[in-house]
């Protein structure tokens, strides 16, 4: 288990992380979300042992993070962090040695992963000669080269085409099923919802939401209703508790403040007749995020 307990980090007088706590269990994919500057990168660096917390503790399987423990951690950064003048093989040996892997172990694992991703022919090519998408593949391969207990993924699908996104998704699920703890951070909320049963949203270094996604959605009172019926927009906007109506080509999306408004909306719609659709949906994670941090996550 990864345990982050009451962690605070100052840079001088600036508090980058403020009393942050969460756990990631074996085989769990945990979402850590926040806008740029929220404190995610600082948190990742503390988990990696690159920075020491000013206050609090971080442990992996009960051991305080140190150089020995970080051998069991893999990290895919949002930014390219490859040494572009090295070949893929040289880069893998360099990275694997940092994780105390032996050269024959590194090359065996590298050959397996290159073959799995269909890029074996790039083994002796320099990083700078590869496309951005293939560089991202290599960066991902290096992050999982040591079969990490803990894997941190920061925007893992950046620069990938849809086919390779699916390959990465399959690999992430496989790693989780094999017991890896995964911290997943992305601007793409649909990806977070796909992978993460548990998450935290941080703002200015402080947790604003933390828990299981299912529970978070249930506690978030606003809902969306999708309606197809013989009804006009103004009939819906004047219902108490309706906070927004979006008119689409053949249906209305009605936003309400809580579940109690559902029956009111249904009564009005039913009286108008010809109801072919009335579906109540939970809010998306993106809607919840926007309500908490005040801006779109993907902007």
Spans of model-derived segments:
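Structural motif detector for alpha-helix initiation sites
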Residues: 88, 213, 282-285
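ABC transporter nucleotide-binding domains
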Residues: 2, 9-203, 209
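ABC transporter nucleotide-binding domain
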Residues: 170-255
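Active-site phosphate/pyrophosphate- and oxyanion-stabilizing loops and adjacent acidic/basic residues
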Residues: 93, 190, 214, 267, ...
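ABC-family P-loop ATPase nucleotide-binding domain
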Residues: 1-8, 295-299
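Residues that scaffold the ATP/ADP-binding catalytic core of kinase and kinase-like folds
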Residues: 68, 216, 288, 292
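A broad structural signal for alpha-helix termini and local helix breaks/kinks
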Residues: 11, 99-100, 117, 220, ...
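Short, charged/small-residue-rich alpha-helical element at the C-terminal edge
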Residues: 223-298
């Amino acid at each position: 288990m990864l345990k982050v307990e009451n962690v605070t980090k100052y840079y001088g007088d600036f508090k980058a992380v403020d009393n942050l706590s969460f756990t990631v269990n074996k085989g769990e994919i945990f979402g850590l979300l926040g806008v740029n500057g929220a404190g995610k990168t600082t948190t990742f660096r503390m988990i990696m042992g690159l920075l020491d917390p000013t206050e609090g503790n971080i442990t992996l399987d009960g051991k305080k993070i140190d150089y020995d423990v970080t051998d069991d951690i893999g990290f895919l950064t949002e930014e390219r962090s490859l040494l572009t003048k090295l070949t893929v093989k040289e880069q893998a040996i360099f990275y694997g040695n940092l994780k105390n892997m032996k050269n024959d172990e590194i090359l065996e694992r590298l050959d397996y992963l290159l073959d799995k991703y269909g890029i074996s022919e790039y083994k002796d090519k320099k990083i700078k000669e590869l496309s951005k998408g293939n560089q991202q593949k290599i960066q991902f391969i290096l992050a999982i080269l040591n079969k990490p207990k803990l894997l941190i993924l920061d925007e893992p699908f950046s620069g990938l085409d849809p086919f390779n996104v699916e390959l990465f998704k399959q690999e992430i699920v496989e790693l989780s099923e094999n017991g890896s703890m995964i911290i997943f951070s992305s601007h793409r909320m649909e990806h977070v919802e796909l992978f993460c049963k548990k998450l935290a949203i941080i703002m200015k270094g402080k947790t604003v939401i933390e828990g299981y996604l299912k529970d978070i959605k249930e506690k978030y009172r606003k809902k969306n209703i999708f309606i197809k019926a013989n009804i006009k927009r103004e009939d819906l906007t004047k219902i108490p508790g309706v906070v927004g109506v979006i008119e689409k080509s053949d249906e209305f999306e009605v936003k309400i403040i809580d579940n109690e408004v559902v029956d009111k909306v249904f009564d009005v719609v039913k009286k108008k007749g010809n109801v072919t659709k009335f579906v109540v949906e939970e809010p998306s994670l993106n809607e919840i995020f926007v309500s908490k941090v005040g801006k779109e996550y993907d902007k």
